[in-house]
Swiss-Prot record:
Keyword Hydrolase on entry: yes
Taxonomy of the source species: Bacteria, Pseudomonadati, Bacteroidota, Flavobacteriia, Flavobacteriales
Family of the protein in this entry: Belongs to the glutaminase family.
Enzyme Commission number(s) of this protein: 3.5.1.2
Alphabetized UniProt keyword annotations: Hydrolase
Species of the source: Christiangramia forsetii (strain DSM 17595 / CGMCC 1.15422 / KT0803)
Keyword rRNA-binding (UniProt): no
Any one biological process term the GO annotation gives: glutamate biosynthetic process
Residues the record lists as binding substrate: S63, N113, E157, N164, Y188, Y240, V258
Catalytic activity field: L-glutamine + H2O = L-glutamate + NH4(+)
Name of this chain's protein: Glutaminase
InterPro entries in the cross-refs: Beta-lactam/transpept-like (IPR012338), Glutaminase (IPR015868)
Assembly notes: Homotetramer.
Short name of one Pfam family: Glutaminase
């Protein structure tokens, strides 16, 4: 398979001029990102790399970070985690308050904001320094100590994060938050501010394509059954209320973020990351969705 030729074809066929969406504006720092940015990186099971465009430029990964924190929480709690979270697609916007009242404070899945905040509560409760340990986890699975939080983005999120603060308070009132609100939202804003490139993300997500092992060293990080559950959740819940569309068009487990990044995996084959900050009405990268659909069409390879 000539992945580089396929990526070059995608790069030639697509442009930011072809999409009509907008860069995220509700977080002030994200609104400053150049809408022309576009990059893609494929990391294969034989350790080959293929890329184009702005694939080495860091951006705010936002909700993609929820996959990392879920993996950490599952290592800590195992199956007991699902006493506090459900595993169903939500069908509502990612920051919705509505479902919580009807479902007694149990978030519909770990990738909507309410679910990710319950995960944050668990990590704040059980880890001595959750910010440090999350960064160490991501650096380890990526093999790159240059990954960092973007302090400016974290502060920008905090300045406008009233709905997330409301979510934590509401879940706490319903009995599914243990810690104080402030450290939970502080950790959450920092995790979303993680700055990574497509190249780094494709390497990090290879553990989900490689049965929980770091490809280069074969070190076991996650149990295979943990990876199976995370991949299933990415397939059904990884794209806000557009998960069905992504499965239909692309056909792989993946996760998006409002920073414009998308990561997807084909188990035992590759991990692919794409970044374009222009979002569609559902908060997913418009050009990224199109690029990944074209990628699986041209390769003829998906999980279906």
């Amino acid at each position: 398979m000539d992945y580089q030729q396929i990526l070059d074809t995608i790069n030639d066929e697509m442009s930011y001029r072809d999409v009509t969406g907008k860069v995220a504006s509700y977080i002030p720092e994200l609104a400053k990102v150049d809408r022309r940015k576009f990059g893609m990186h494929v990391y294969c099971g034989d350790q080959q790399h293929f890329s184009f465009g702005d694939s080495e430029e860091n951006f705010s990964i936002q909700s993609i970070s929820k996959v990392f924190t879920l993996a950490m929480a599952m290592r800590l709690m195992g199956e007991d985690l699902w006493d506090r979270l459900d595993v169903e697609p939500s069908g509502d916007p990612f920051n919705s308050l509505t479902q919580l009242e009807y479902e007694s404070g149990i978030p519909r899945n770990p990738f909507i904001n309410a679910g990710a905040l319950v995960i944050s509560d668990i990590l704040v409760d059980q880890l001595e320094d959750p910010k440090k340990e999350l960064l160490e986890f991501v650096r380890k699975i990526t093999g790159d100590d240059n990954i960092h939080y973007n302090e400016t983005v974290a502060a920008s999120e905090k300045s406008t994060g009233y709905r997330n603060i409301a979510l934590v308070n509401y879940i706490k009132a319903l009995g599914n938050i243990k810690c104080d609100v402030e450290p939970i939202v502080d950790f959450y804003f920092y995790q979303c501010s993680l700055a990574m490139s497509c190249s780094q993300l494709s390497k990090a997500f290879m553990i989900f394509a490689n049965k929980g092992r770091i490809l280069e060293t074969d070190e076991k990080i996650l149990k295979p059954k943990t990876v199976k559950r995370i991949n299933a959740l990415m397939q059904t819940c990884g794209f806000y209320d557009e998960a069905g569309e992504f499965s239909f068009q692309v056909g792989m487990p993946g996760k998006s973020g409002v920073g414009g990044g998308i990561v997807a995996i084909h188990p035992d084959n590759y991990s692919v990351a794409v970044w374009s900050p222009i979002l569609n009405e559902n908060g997913n990268s418009e050009l990224g969705m199109k690029a990944l659909e074209r990628f699986t069409t041209l390769t003829g390879v998906s999980v279906f």
